[in-house]
Amino acid sequence: TLKFFNNKLYCGSDGGIYVSEDGGVTFQDYTINGIAVGQFYRISVAKDDSGKMVGGLQDNSGFIRNNEVWNVYTGGDGMDYEVDPTNNNIVYGFVQFGDPLFVSTNSGQTVGTINSPAGNGNWITPLALSSEGDVYAGYDAVYKLNGNTWERLSDDLGNTPIDDLEVDPNNPLVLYAAEGNTVFRSDDGGITFTEFNVFDSGISDIAINTTDGSAIYVTTSNRVGFAQNQQQDLRGVFKVPAETNGAAGAVVDLTLNLPQDHAYFAIVH
C-alpha cells in the first residue's frame, strides 16, 4: 500500500515499511533495524565458511550474507539457492518455477542468468550441487548444467515436476529425487532412477547423511508457503538407511512429539 501523510510517502510492502520525503525518488527503510519481515524458502551455507550463506525469500528476492552483511543479488521470488562447495564466491539461485537460474562468480557483486530448459518446474524448483561443483536441477526430469546450457539426463520420473533433488556429498554419482510420495535413487549420476521408498504422504524434503551417505532423512508435508488447509494430514520426519547395494533399509520414524500443524524441512550440515 502507498499513503501520503504530512508530505511524506509511506510504502507498506512484503519487504517492510519505507518512507520517502522526496515524492518517491528515494526511500528510507524503517524495518532495517530488527523487524523481521522476510520468509526464507531455502538457505545454503558455504562448506568452508559458516558465516557465508545464500537464501531465497518469498516475494523478497535472493540474498547473500558475506562478511556479516546481507545483500540482494537476485529479483523476483527467491527460491532454492546454493553455494558452490569448491569455491564459495560462486553462488546460484532460482526464482519461481526455476526460470531463470541466477549465477554469480563474485559473491553477488555481478550476476548473470541462464534460461530454464523446456521442462516444467515447480513453484520451488529444486537446485542441487555435487561436492565437485556440478549443478543439477529438477524440472519434469533431472537436468545438469553444461556451460550455459541445461542438459537433460533422465526420463520423467512421474507425471508431475520433481519436488526435491539432492546429490550425495560423499559420492557424486548418487542422486535422490522426490516426486509426490516417492523417493527415487540414481547410481549413475542422474541418468537412470529407480524407486527407493514410498511414503504415506507427499514428500517436502530430502537430506543426506554428510558423513558417509549411509542414510537419508525425509520429511513429509506440503512445503512452506502453503495455507494450513492445504497441508497434508500425515506429516513426519523419517530416517531411511541406504544399504550397500543401493536399496532402502527399514524406515525409522523420527517424528516423536513434533507438532502436527507445521510444514517440515530437513537440513544436515
Which role fits each region the language model picked out?
Residues 1-269:
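Beta-propeller blade termini and top-face loops
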